[in-house]
Amino acid sequence: MRRSTDPRNLLVRRGPLLVDGESAISELDPGFFPTGDAPKMSSTTRRRFNLIAFTPGPVTVISSLVYLALLIPLLLVHTIVPSAPKSNPKGVDLSEAWNDLQHLTSGFHPYNSHRNDEIHQWLLQRVGHILDASRKAHEDDAMGSVAPDVFVFDDQQSNLTFSGGGVGNKPITGVYFEGKNIIVYIRGLEDDKENWWDSPGGKPKGKGGVLVNAHYDSVSTGFGATDDGVGVVSVLQLIKFFTSPGNLPRKGLVLLLNNGEEDYLNGARAYSQHPLSKYTHTFLNLEGAGAGGRAALFRTTDTEVTRFYKSSPHPFGSVLAADGFKMGLIRSETDYAVFKGVLGLRGLDVAFIEPRARYHTDQDDVRHTSIDSVWHMLSAAIATTKGLVSYTGSEFDGRAPGKGMVNSGVGTHGVWFDLFGSSFAVFRLHTLFAISVTLLVVCPIVLFVIGIILSKMDKMYLFSIHETIPETKEKVSVRGLRGLFRYPIILVVSSGILIGLSYLLAKVNPFIVHSSSYAVWSMMLSSWIFMTWFLSCIADFFRPSALHRAYTFTWQLLVMWVLLVISTVYVNQHDIAAGYFIVFYFAGTFLATLISYLELFALPNKTQYAREQSQYPSRLGSNRSSRILSPSADELPTGGDNNGEIYDGEEEPTESSSLLGRQRRTTFANYTRTGRDLASSESGTYEDHSETGVFGEEQKWSASLPTWTWVLQFLFVGPVVIMFIGQLGLFLTSAMNQVGADGVGLLVVYIAIAVFSVLLLIPLSPFIHRFTYHVPTFLLLVFIATLIYNLAAFPFSAENRLKIFFVQELNLDTGRNQVSLTGVDPYVQDIIRAIPSASKENISCDSELDSGRRKCSWPGLAPEVVQDEPTDRWLSFNISKPSSQETKDTPVLHARLHVSGKNTRACRVNFERPIRDYSLPGSALDDRMPHTLPQGISEIRLWSRTWENVWTVDVQWDAEDMDELHGRVVCLWSDANQLGSIPALDELRLFAPPWVAISKLKDGLVEVSRGF
């Protein structure tokens, strides 16, 4: 058969041909020329590859690169601590700080331990050495600087009776505490020069000072490197810094090393009784709830004080954590609660937050932190404190926020977050509210107006099914409704799979997130991307639509509008700023949606399009096979039917011909391609798009749409979402992935990861149908691998241990010696079986306490916490005979208890029924912290600064409730520094599996009790 060499008569080609008698050939198949040589083309007609066209290559590459370019830095910021400087900054000695931390953490030092007394004396010596060096530096200073006035208070007088606990109508817990705080006051250049605290009833004058706090006690099972050793050495370095020449504070600075934070914030409460507590108006609290890493800004009282943290060299944190406290999602507390809630100070809480598995365990030591972590907290403390003591305004000198509080003024609620650990944003919550309301109102109006204009111009292809030609009344299909419901279906299915995976992990291997949170993230992300891509490709295959992006962004805008409404309500009614990221998410989505609507102005009006289409015959065939196997009418150079000339460029089929023909090929990603698709794919471009503007089988009017605007849309949405959602997702994971050992259900953790995975990847939805198969296929393999791993892997390791909680209880009435471990079933029973002394004992386990935790007990090795004394003399008490007293309401009975314990300074009294009131002679009372409430007291905790103290406790109760007082006296021992003092604990540490961490269950490691 003779081949035609006239390019106007050829159909089988790699690019479409132009008509009007000109040979505008892009690239002809050389097989159509007898000599095998294709005609040469001018450079003006040669097809070019568009680097930003909305085609598979650019979409896949650009989207992937943007995600990688932002996610990788986020991961690096989250996991790598900025390096400490090689040389010491002025006024700071990092080597000295590290040596101090090593000494501080060389043993357990809870309040109820002899090591605690040693640390107390050592800290006083260190403060003295620092001040001596400071005075010498001022003497040697060539500028003739004068050393500041510095006062050191070894507070051995402050004590307090107060109450804690008690929810609703439940009885409360009474507390008597004797403080052992160390307070250093550096007089500011503008401070009153009088020692007003020496005068009875003396009050400070002038502007309020600044308080920096850290606690030097640890828990009985942790060395306290980050909880709160780094905070303590930071305070020591702050003393050094602000007493150095050139660094003297303008406002007075109080540095508090408090003792007793781990036991219900007792040290901070004792500080409230010191005269200097009336002087400070702002504060910085340094804490730790992890072991190493970055010190995060955990929470703040207001916008104004938060701005001083902005000068930190490496800021880190989000208001999301602060709102977690407000909503009760975070149950642990720090001294921040006392400074803000009792004293009325305004300030910040900076703390280490991960890994929680090391918190309150023997891995909270110097081996698991670094000098980089020390510098991260110290540098933030220096920058923040320097700003506060240099501030001369009156912002923090206003009316008191409450009765009995200092005159610190009232701040505004704030929004704050870091960006890549290098910059910090802070603004008022009211500003967020105003922006939110503006966006909620303006954005829909703008789109509505644009929609009206498009309709007036007859270019509103969205939601259009067909267009009627006015002259002939003929209806021409515009297929503008295609893809309308595609996105919500795909979103629900893909996201629903993640929720299903969350339930699957929570059921099969709930603790895998404890050690392998990144594997869980990888599984969630890869699953969502692959499923969304797969469903989008199927939808695009059967019903291709050029309006896919516009409809997707419209749906996203609608969803984000609803979320922004909810967030705005919480901002207005509850002062919750955690949804701040929704504002940026919504704004980016609106701009992307706006571009999709503006693109429609480039289209011909629908009536004109209908007239043009009515001049051409209908497309050949109505099913998908006609698209695949034959060119359609709009592909013909003249719009004619498929006739004999169609196959003029292909040899007549023979027995040796390919079944599919030379111009069709089946692929995984694009199913069956036509010849022109195949050729363009092989050359890296999709020429049907670059030449005619129509991609594949999308609507023919889409040829007029710009091909580059998708890049703008992606850049408006993608980077903003990645920065905010990625950071918050990592932050939440660090804070929550290891809470299962504390009795918190882990399903909420998996649901949170699933939700943040969806939020993180939603920006890909409008473009993912253009992805090549390579990335989704790779992610499918990642999903399969991580799913298998997450379901089958053992969830704990030596680096990510399971925390169990120890206590040994000795009942002197029955002689029963019981060792107990509280932990997650079935692991806690596996651990007990590894203990030699428990292997032959009858193990009794209580019913489930919370989220799978159980308390299992067995007769254990006898404790040796008191030397050379029989067990029945370890505690002693006596109770006076009750006496009655008439009141206006009911008769009241009184009794006096004398309680003492050997080699301890902590006991408590438990009552079978709540008592009405109690008091201790010589103890201070504070109306800001009532010592009793109407529901009564069920327990009194007693803490003394001296060993083997005798507490005198007066109690009273209603005579109609009980004639006699019944309860138990319990004394506590918490010193595990000496091997052999608690053999049961020593044995557990020796024989427990390496993936087990031991923490305290109660105030004491050993608790000995006797009834009365």
From Swiss-Prot:
Entry's transmembrane regions: 61-81, 433-453, 488-508, 519-539, 551-571, 576-596, 711-731, 744-764, 778-798
Region (Disordered): 614-660
Keywords assigned: Glycoprotein, Hydrolase, Membrane, Metal-binding, Metalloprotease, Protease, Transmembrane, Transmembrane helix, Vacuole, Zinc
Amino acid composition bias (Polar residues), ranges on this chain: 614-629
GO molecular function: metal ion binding; metalloexopeptidase activity
Bilayer topology annotation: Multi-pass membrane protein
Cofactor(s) recorded in Swiss-Prot or TrEMBL: Zn(2+)
Vacuolar topology ranges: 82-432, 509-518, 572-575, 732-743, 799-1012
Signal peptide extent: none
Cofactor, how bound (note): Binds 2 Zn(2+) ions per subunit.
Biological process per Gene Ontology, one example term: proteolysis
Catalytic-site annotation from UniProt: 261
Cytoplasmic domain ranges by topology: 1-60, 454-487, 540-550, 597-710, 765-777
Function: May be involved in vacuolar sorting and osmoregulation.
Family designation: Belongs to the peptidase M28 family.
The name this protein goes by in its record: Vacuolar membrane protease
